[in-house]
Design a protein with these regions (language model features):
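Short helix/loop capping segments that flank catalytic or ligand/cofactor-binding pockets
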Residues: 29-32, 50-51, 143-145
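Active-site-proximal substrate-binding core of FAD-dependent oxidoreductases
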Residues: 83, 88, 92, 159-176
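Hydrophobic, well-ordered secondary-structure elements that form the walls
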Residues: 41, 67, 71, 133, ...
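FAD cofactor-binding and catalytic pocket of flavoenzymes
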Residues: 1-47, 92, 99-116, 161-165
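Conserved FAD/dinucleotide-binding core of flavoprotein oxidoreductases
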Residues: 33-70
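Secondary-structure transition/capping motifs at alpha-helix termini
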Residues: 72-78, 160-165
Length: 176
């Protein structure tokens, strides 16, 4: 992981990328034709620019091949099973879903952007400056990924403001 991070700091993708792989068709086979699967890879430390320049088609293809080779090193025959591949760059993620530089964590996971500094100092308890408007998501503590913790934490603060017990957040939906 550290080598991947070091490569990212130098503005390139890692030759030994750190991957999060998901195969949703293992739990929902209706997402692909019978006997086929869909796999998604999230590559940590993918630079928003390569060597200070925008991604090119050649960069995307080479990056995709690096990721495929990383998987194939641990899963012989993997390459032969691929019918289609699509690479999304950080810039494309920014344009498509508003993630600055493709960062799913909505800010670096560094001390100056964590805990009481997330999303910004003074607004770390899920309340915005507007009464009744709460914040949750990747930009709030504890950060991004798909875990739901920021939403749960914001729900607890809403319950506190409504003077409702926080013992069972599921009941709050019916009250609101």
């Amino acid at each position: 992981m550290e080598r991947a991070y070091d490569d990212w700091k130098m503005g390139t993708w890692s030759r030994d990328p750190f991957l999060d792989m998901m195969i949703p068709t293992l739990t929902d086979p209706t997402m692909a034709p019978p006997g086929k699967h869909f796999m998604s890879c999230f590559v940590q430390y993918c630079p928003p620019k390569v060597g200070g320049k925008n991604w090119t088609k050649e960069n995307k293809d080479a990056f995709g091949e690096t990721v495929i080779q990383q998987i194939a090193d641990y899963s012989p025959g993997f390459k032969d099973k691929i019918l289609h591949m699509e690479v999304r760059t950080p810039k494309e993620l920014e344009e498509e879903v508003g993630l600055t530089e493709g960062n799913i964590f909505q800010g670096e996971l560094t001390f100056d952007q964590l805990l009481f500094n997330r999303p910004i100092p003074g607004y770390a308890q899920y309340r915005s400056p507007i009464k009744g408007l709460y914040m949750c998501g990747s930009s709030t503590h504890p950060g991004g990924g798909v875990m739901g913790a920021p939403g749960r934490n914001a729900a607890v603060e809403i319950l506190k403001d409504l003077n409702l017990p926080e013992s069972d957040i599921r009941d709050a939906y019916e009250v609101l």
